[in-house]
Amino acid sequence: MQRMIRALLTILMGTALAVITVPALPAQAGIWHEYPTTLNTTCSETRVHNGTAYQVCLEFNGNRTQVRAVAFINPGAYTNFQVNLRLWFGGDGPDISDSCPTMTTNASRACYTAFTDLRRPYVVTEAKFGIAGTWQLPVRALDMRLSAKQQERGNWCGPGAVQTTLATIGISAPPQSELADKLQTGETLFGATMPGRIPAVINSYIPASDWQYKWEEIAVSNGQTYEAGINRIVTSLSRGRPVMVLVIPGKLPWWNSSTPTLRHYVTITGYGGVVHADGSVHPTTFKVADPADASEHSIDVDKLLLDNANLAWNGIDSAVIVRT
């Protein structure tokens, strides 16, 4: 009997060791799906290769507490495609990779990650598509854990945008009345908030060791300085720091009235664009929060800066931004 027990124990121990030494299974690749119904997204531009359109988006849940990455592709004809998809967070947040294998079809398809908690300071997704055997430049979208605030008075867009900026960074946002006093909004002609007063007010609520805000004029009539200004906006967003911009509200696509004499602040919190071979990002769209009603909108970069912001400050050729 003892011999049988020893033999049984030997078998069981061998089985346990065998279980321990079995190699881990590789991560499962994603699968292509039909297009999902999306509600709130921040997306890269739609690019086209050989008649096949593609883009990547950050999709947020209804209360903007969770996010996932979605890669969309729309073939113009039967073709093969695949995608490598990545979702990551600034700071020490998680870094999630997924991929959908080669598929041949003429139907629209989407590859996406699972929803995960949205974290500060920012979230990024990037997708690299292989289409008809050729890898494309990666497309990217970045956004933040937005905490949009609605201005409490008709001329408090400045305090509302500053409050949105601080809350989105993760700082307990002070009352708009306090911000309006510090910005001297009520002491200015027409009750306006002057851009030069904004950086010091924002910086008074953040540590001196953190990125400090400043304001500047971008000379948009010069291609080189215009691109440099866009790069500085991208740099600030890539730090998880929103950017405020002065605009003529009636020229915004979501406004329904002409306001040639009014000025207004909106807050840029994200972008969508393409990643070039040298690693630089060229955005084609911005995601903005409008304090008029605490709404979010996507807008073409040139539409915002060239067709709108450049007319808001001195009437010609320069846009005013507040950024880190």
Task: Go through the PLM ranges and name each one.
Residues 1-57:
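N-terminal prepro-regions of secreted/extracellular proteins
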Residues 34-87:
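Short, surface-exposed binding/anchoring microloops in extracellular/periplasmic proteins
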Residues 40-41, 55, 98, 109, ...:
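Extracellular secreted precursors and ectodomains with disulfide-bonded cysteine-rich loops/domains
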Residues 98-140:
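Short, solvent-exposed, Trp/other aromatic-anchored flexible loops in extracytoplasmic proteins
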Residues 142-227, 310-324:
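Cysteine-nucleophile protease catalytic domains, especially the papain-like/related folds used
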Residues 225-289:
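Active-site-adjacent substructure of cysteine-protease-like catalytic cores
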Residues 260, 271-324:
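Noncatalytic regulatory segments and standalone regulatory/sensor domains
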